[in-house]
Amino acid sequence: MTTIETQPQVEQRQEVLPPWSVILHNDDVNTMDYVVRALLKSVPSLGQVQANKIMLEAHTRGSARVTTCPLELAELYRDRLESFGLTATIEQA
């Protein structure tokens, strides 16, 4: 008699990490050019045009969404922006 061994099926699930937004807040200290340069150095995926738009939105509306990404990356970008003396926060998107 032959014995057949069966292995239990293992269900693999991939969980999608919830998105977080990095928010840049306006300030009256840093120049517009400085903010654009800080954005470009802090968030590598941004281009010059995007950085300008984000800076102008933060300047006119008080805040602007820089990017949306997983939490760990959002924390990194926030910390980088803050290292340039900018005010940035993260919030769940």
Regions found by a protein language model. Name each.
Residues M1-A93:
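Terminal domain-initiation and capping elements
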